Amino acid sequence: MGRVEDQIKDNYNSLSHEGERLNREAKIESEKLKNNAKLDAKDMKKDIDESVHSSWETVKEGAKTVQDYISSGIESVKHTITTEPAQKDMENLKHNVNHNLEEAEKEGSSVLNNISNFFKGSAEEAKSEAERIGYEAYKDGDQFVGDVHKNFKRTANETQKDANRLTSDVKNESNKIYKDIKDESNKLYNDVKGESSKIYNGAKKEGSKLATDLKKDTQYVADETKKMAADLKNKAADTYQDLSHDASKKATQLKKKASETLDESADAIEHQFDIMKKDFRHLNQRNGMIWGSIGLIGGATATSYLFPSASPMAKFTFIAGLASLGGYYGLHQPHNKIVDNAFHKANNKKEELKKKI
């Protein structure tokens, strides 16, 4: 019987380790997504900085040509052309993107920690209840423990398979979400880069053309420069709105997937509780027959030795009473009540967790 009890404890220990493994894999996936996003953002900023620097250097060269044509009002024109109007907008865009990434990281960590705590807490409570049930059966010396152990071992294997499948599903979904975000970010980045190139190339051409007759068109140059700066600012604002909307959409998908995974896990736990209840119901039925027989034999023996002169009806009543009492005692062992309490605790925790997701 000691070997059976040890095996029951080992099986539940493996379930607890499985929950810890799920937590480690979730953290690895989260770190991978965060690091890749930061690398992409860094590359995007580097490319934009290089494009801006190169384009504005060309415009500055055009400004030198302007100085050869006019002397009056040159400081105003020079300031208008050589100041980088998009620099502040790019800094704002970088700040907003970094803030958005930090918020997504905090929210994702909270969801993953809640799921991890649910798995770990459920495994520990189930382990405690199983050890209690196993000890009760071991103390009674019931041979039925062998059958219960076989069913429990099969149940533990099925639970581990379900956990592995759910882990694979979450991992695949995480990879898919990251790929979608990366593809969408690359598309938006290419749009910004292409639009920036068009704006700065236009500035270069316009600057060279207007430099030849700047004496007449000084105000026009200033207006065109302001217009190009406004175009770039609007494009940056539109890009940030698209990124923000896409991030919110992906966060909603992640929450939905987390909720579905939680429901599937809770259903699997409920299924295992149902199997245990069925096994213990059979055990109670058999105990009822055994204790009923004990009551019947005990009643017959007692009436033969203690009440030899009693009437047949009195003897029959006494024997039937002991048999009924024994049967009732056997049928109402508290196994399923223990299982029900454990299930209700796990279900209540699941509902609390769903409110936090």
Curated annotation (Swiss-Prot):
Q: Where does this protein reside within or beyond the cell?
A: Membrane
Q: Superkingdom of the source?
A: Eukaryota
- The record lists glycosylation at 114, 157, 172
Query: What broad class describes the main subcellular location of this protein?
Result: membrane
Q: Does the keyword Transmembrane apply?
A: yes
Show the coiled coil region(s): 5-51, 150-177, 223-270
- Record key words, sorted: Coiled coil, Glycoprotein, Membrane, Transmembrane, Transmembrane helix
Gene Ontology CC terms, in alphabetical order? membrane
GO BP: any one term:
hyperosmotic response
Q: What is this protein called?
A: SrfA-induced gene J protein
